[in-house]
């Protein structure tokens, strides 16, 4: 534009040094303008989006530090802290994954993990100028959020499934009242749980409890003893006035493993043992064992033996050392492979099918021999399972537990039992109510009571069991 005639042009009067000074001022002004741009504008689209996906809120820290700090806390710090806690407490992972509050927290954290990254990516996109940088940031952001959302959605679904299993398998809260009390204070300081292995298959009369093991825990020391009850024990007594006592005043005339199916098939008797959602057949059996042996039974755990096979497979197997060769049984319903004629001697790693055959075999000895093997197998499983194994295999375990396990324990009580059993050193004594100690065909229940009292005293006082 031309200067008015009354204003002279002094440009021609400027010296070379003046031109240099003006150029320096222009460069400084350009640098100042660039430094005042948002930090996210100085990064490329891919770098800003990557920062938002890894550490949500970090790209927008200089624009809105409060929002950035909140996103970073909810989307990065808390998830990382949760993973660290799970790793540090991996030996207690059973109690964590069976805690409904923990599962709910996991679901909330998974949702926040995705939402915080979505918000951070939107902030990055809004900070870009119109055109190709914004389009590139949008494309990268959407792809990244979807990619991270997939494992988060899977985690929420698994946690929700596990919550369903907890509600199906366990009672909502543990009861302070024992399942079957005997009115004797000799068992004070102990918690006793009845483990039942239900053998349901072709030719069976409902569900027969061929495996019955009392796990008695000295609560102060954590020491544990296991007592196997023979399936062929006769004359089981019941508390006076109960439906089973009225039906069988001289004792149950059949094998002990027939009590469960008898109650199951007689609704008029089963109805008298109803207690919430618990199995009335298990309550009736527990009351008979409690009264006959003068021991308070606090809870029960019932496992279908087919589920026992599946549980061992889901845990990756179990290893036992056999002192001698053991003949294996014929084909068992549900077995996944054909049994070899023998296993052992020496170290044997068993899958679920082999372990079930080991626990069920009577070919090499008798019912009494297999009772001892069942206790050995339970001890081995409990002591060999690592917390990391439970965590990595839990999705399979939960589905198996849904249809194979029923119990009067709450999820918290069950996880505490598993944690105690996993400490193999805490299982101090193991005994079967078998000859020559006990005659199952004509049992003297006073002798059984004395034996159990001595067993509890031995683990309470940490002394040798006199009947061993």
Label every model-predicted segment.
Residues 31-39:
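Membrane-interfacial, low-structure loops and terminal tails that flank and connect transmembrane helices
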Residues 39-69, 73-76:
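Hydrophobic, aromatic-rich membrane-embedded alpha-helical segments
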């Amino acid at each position: 534009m031309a200067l008015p005639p009354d204003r002279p042009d002094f440009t021609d009067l400027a010296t070379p040094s003046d031109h240099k000074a003006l150029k320096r001022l222009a460069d400084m002004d350009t640098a100042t303008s660039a430094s005042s741009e948002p930090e996210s504008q100085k990064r490329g689209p891919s770098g800003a989006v990557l920062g938002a996906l890894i550490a949500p809120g970090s790209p927008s820290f200089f624009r809105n530090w409060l929002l950035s700090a909140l996103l970073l806390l909810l989307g990065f710090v808390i998830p990382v802290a949760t993973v660290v806690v799970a790793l540090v407490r991996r030996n207690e992972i059973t109690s964590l994954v069976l805690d409904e509050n923990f599962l709910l927290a996991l679901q909330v954290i998974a949702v926040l993990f995705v939402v915080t990254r979505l918000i951070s990516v939107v902030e990055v996109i809004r900070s870009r100028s119109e055109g190709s940088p914004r389009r590139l940031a949008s494309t990268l952001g959407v792809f990244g959020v979807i990619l991270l959302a997939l494992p988060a959605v899977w985690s929420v679904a698994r946690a929700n499934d596990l919550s369903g299993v907890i509600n199906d398998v366990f009672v909502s809260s543990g009861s302070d009242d024992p399942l079957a009390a005997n009115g004797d204070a000799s068992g004070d300081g102990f918690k006793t749980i009845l483990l039942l292995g239900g053998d349901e298959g072709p030719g069976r009369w409902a569900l027969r409890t061929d495996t019955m093991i009392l796990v008695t825990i000295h609560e102060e020391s954590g020491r544990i003893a296991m007592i196997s009850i023979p399936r062929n024990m006769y004359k089981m007594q019941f508390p006076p006035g109960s439906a089973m006592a009225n039906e069988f005043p001289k004792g149950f005339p059949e094998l002990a493993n027939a009590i469960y199916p008898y109650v199951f098939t007689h609704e008029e008797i089963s109805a008298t043992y109803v207690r919430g959602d618990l199995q009335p057949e298990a309550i009736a059996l527990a009351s008979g064992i409690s009264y006959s042996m003068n021991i308070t039974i606090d809870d029960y755990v019932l496992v279908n033996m087919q589920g026992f096979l599946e549980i061992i497979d889901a845990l990756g197997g179990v290893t036992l050392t056999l002192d001698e060769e053991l003949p294996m049984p014929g084909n068992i319903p549900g077995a996944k492979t054909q049994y070899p004629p023998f296993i052992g001697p020496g170290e044997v790693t068993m899958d679920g099918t082999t372990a079930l055959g080991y626990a069920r075999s009577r070919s090499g000895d008798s019912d009494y021999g297999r009772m001892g093997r069942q206790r050995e197998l339970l001890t081995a499983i409990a002591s060999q399972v690592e917390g990391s194994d439970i965590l990595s295999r839990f999705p399979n375990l939960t589905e198996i537990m849904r249809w194979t396990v029923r119990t009067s324990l709450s999820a918290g009580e069950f996880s505490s039992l598993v944690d105690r059993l996993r400490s193999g050193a805490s299982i101090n004594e193991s005994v079967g109510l078998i000859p020559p100690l006990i005659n199952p065909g004509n049992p003297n229940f006073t002798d059984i009571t004395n034996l159990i009292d001595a067993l509890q005293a031995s683990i309470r006082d940490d002394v040798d069991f006199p009947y061993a």
